[in-house]
C-alpha cells in the first residue's frame, strides 16, 4: 500500500496542506521545528489512532484553531486486487471522529486495521532496551494486522485478567477465582502460542537482517519469555501455585501479560551494553522484518515512516540501511535536518521535499 494524498488542516504547524507523496523513497529535509516530524506524526495518527508525541491538549491542534482534520488517500494492492481507499480523522475538542471509505466508524481500531503504518521515531530505540510492554506491543501490532481474530483474543484476555485482578483485590471466595483462572488459562495459552509463533517467523527475517547491517554483533536468536515457566507447567497450574502470592499482591503476577522477548548475541552479554546507534540499528531491523512478514502474509507492504533516520548512524550504516530500503517496493517516508552523505546515492530512486514554515515543496 502507498499513500497518494495527505491533507492536513490545523494540525501542529500546518494550517492547510495538500501533499502527494510518491511510491518508494520520500525524503523530507528541513530545520528543527519546520514540521517534518509532524508530517510523519499525522501518518502515524491515521495508522494507530494516537500520536507518538502526546495528546490533543499537547498541541496537536494548531494554535488559534478550534479543530484539526487529517485526510489520507491510499492505494491498497494485494496479490489479487488493487483499490483506492480514503480515510479521515477530525477532532473538535471533545473526541476523535473517524471515517473510512465514506462511512463513519465507531472505533478507531477499524481505521487502524485498514492503514498499516510502521513508525520509527525518537523513542523507538527503547523497543530493545526498555520495558517489556513495548516488546509485547510490537508483537501484538503484527498479529493484529495479519490475523483477523487476534484483536478479539487480545481483548478477551485483557477482560478476564481485569476480572481476576478485581477478585484478588476483593479477596473473593475460591470458587469464583477458580472459574476465572480456567478462563484466563484457556485464553492465555492461545495468546502465548500466537505470540511465540509470530516471533519464530520474525526470527527467520531478523537474524539475516541484523547480521547484514551489523555483523560484528553476531546475533544468533530471539529469546521468548512466556511470562511463566511454561516449559515446566501449563498456565492453569502456574496460576494455582501463585494464588497465595497473588492474593497478597492484589494482582496476577504471571501470564502472557508478563511475557517478553530479547535478541541474543554471541559477542556481547546483552542488549544493555549496546550503544544508542547499535540499538537504533537493531530496532530498525526488527521493524523491517515485521514489514517483510506483513508482506508475506498480506501480499502488500505497509507504509514505513522513519523520523530522523540518519541521526546517530555513521555514513556506512546510513548507506546500508538505505540500501535495504531501496530493495523493497514499500513506500518509505524519511525525515532529516540535512542531506546526509549516505542518502545521496538514492536520490535517483526517490523524491526529495523541503519542509519549511508549514509548507512542503518538492526539490527533485
From Swiss-Prot:
GO terms for molecular function: ATP binding; single-stranded DNA binding. InterPro entries: DNA-binding_RecF, DNA-binding_RecF_CS, P-loop_NTPase, RecF/RecN/SMC_N, RecF_2. ATP binds at residues 30-37. It comes from the Bacteria. Pfam families: SMC_N. One of its GO terms (cellular component) is cytoplasm. PROSITE patterns: RECF_1, RECF_2. Keywords: ATP-binding, Cytoplasm, DNA damage, DNA repair, DNA replication, DNA-binding, Nucleotide-binding, SOS response. Its main location: cytoplasm. It is found in: Cytoplasm. SUPFAM superfamilies: P-loop containing nucleoside triphosphate hydrolases. One of its GO terms (biological process) is DNA replication. The RecF protein is involved in DNA metabolism; it is required for DNA replication and normal SOS inducibility. RecF binds preferentially to single-stranded, linear DNA. It also seems to bind ATP. NCBIfam families: recf. Belongs to the RecF family. This is DNA replication and repair protein RecF. It comes from Xylella fastidiosa (strain 9a5c).
Amino acid at each position: 500500500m502507498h499513500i497518494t494524498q495527505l491533507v492536513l488542516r490545523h494540525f501542529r504547524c500546518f494550517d492547510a496542506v495538500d501533499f502527494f507523496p510518491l511510491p518508494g523513497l520520500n525524503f523530507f529535509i528541513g530545520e528543527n521545528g519546520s514540521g517534518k516530524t509532524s508530517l510523519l506524526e499525522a501518518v502515524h495518527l491515521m495508522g494507530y489512532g494516537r500520536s507518538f508525541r502526546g495528546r490533543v491538549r499537547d498541541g496537536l491542534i494548531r494554535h488559534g484553531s478550534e479543530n484539526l482534520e487529517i485526510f489520507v488517500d491510499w492505494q491498497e494492492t494485494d496479490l489479487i486486487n488493487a483499490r483506492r481507499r480514503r480515510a479521515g480523522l477530525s477532532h473538535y475538542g471533545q473526541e476523535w471522529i473517524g471515517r473510512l471509505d465514506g462511512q463513519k466508524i465507531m472505533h478507531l481500531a477499524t481505521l487502524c486495521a485498514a492503514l498499516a503504518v510502521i513508525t520509527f521515531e525518537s523513542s523507538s530505540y527503547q523497543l530493545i532496551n526498555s520495558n517489556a510492554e513495548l516488546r509485547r506491543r510490537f508483537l501484538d501490532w503484527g498479529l493484529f494486522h495479519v490475523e483477523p481474530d487476534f484483536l478479539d483474543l487480545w481483548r478477551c484476555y485483557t477482560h478476564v485478567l481485569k476480572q481476576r485482578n478485581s477478585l484478588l483485590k476483593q479477596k473473593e471466595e475460591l470458587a469464583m477465582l477458580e472459574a476465572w483462572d480456567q478462563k484466563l488459562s484457556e485464553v492465555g495459552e492461545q495468546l502465548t502460542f500466537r505470540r511465540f509463533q509470530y516471533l519464530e517467523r520474525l526470527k527467520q527475517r531478523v537474524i539475516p537482517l541484523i547480521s547484514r547491517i551489523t555483523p560484528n554483533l553476531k546475533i544468533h536468536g530471539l529469546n521468548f519469555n512466556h511470562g511463566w515457566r511454561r516449559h515446566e507447567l501449563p498456565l492453569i497450574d502456574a496460576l494455582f501455585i501463585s494464588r497465595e502470592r497473588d492474593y497478597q499482591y492484589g494482582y496476577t503476577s504471571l501470564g502472557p501479560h508478563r511475557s517478553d522477548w530479547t535478541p541474543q548475541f554471541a559477542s556481547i552479554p546483552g542488549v544493555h551494553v549496546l550503544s544508542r546507534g547499535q540499538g537504533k540499528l537493531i530496532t530498525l531491523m526488527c521493524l523491517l522484518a515485521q514489514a517483510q512478514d506483513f508482506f508475506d502474509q498480506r501480499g502488500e507492504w505497509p507504509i514505513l515512516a522513519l523520523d530522523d533516520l540518519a541521526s546517530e548512524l555513521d555514513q556506512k550504516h546510513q548507506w546500508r540501511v538505505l540500501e535495504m530500503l531501496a530493495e523493497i517496493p514499500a513506500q518509505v517516508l524519511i525525515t532529516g535536518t540535512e542531506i546526509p552523505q549516505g542518502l545521496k546515492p538514492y536520490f535517483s530512486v526517490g523524491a526529495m521535499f523541503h519542509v519549511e514554515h508549514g509548507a512542503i515543496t518538492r526539490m527533485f
